[in-house]
């Protein structure tokens, strides 16, 4: 499986999908890793890691949107 991963953002996208227990949406996380600033993704991931949510992917997307809006306002 790793033979298809040639760039760092792809690796980080796979890492996100595994951490969020959402491997079937790994393409989405690879795209986010390519287009969204890394600090926003890491903050959203740490927020989800500290939570006890059933749907970690949805919580991650919600928090990421909040962080992006806050960044755009400042």
Task: Give the location of each predicted region.
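Alpha-helix initiation and capping sites
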Residues: 25, 37-41
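Long, charged low-complexity interaction segments
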Residues: 1-32, 74
């Amino acid at each position: 499986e790793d033979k298809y991963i040639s760039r760092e953002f792809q690796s980080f996208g796979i890492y996100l999908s595994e951490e969020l227990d959402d491997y079937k949406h790994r393409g989405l996380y690879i795209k986010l890793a390519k287009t969204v600033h890394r600090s926003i993704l890491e903050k959203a991931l740490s927020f989800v890691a500290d939570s006890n949510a059933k749907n970690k992917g949805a919580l991650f997307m919600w928090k990421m949107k909040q962080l992006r809006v806050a960044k755009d306002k400042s």
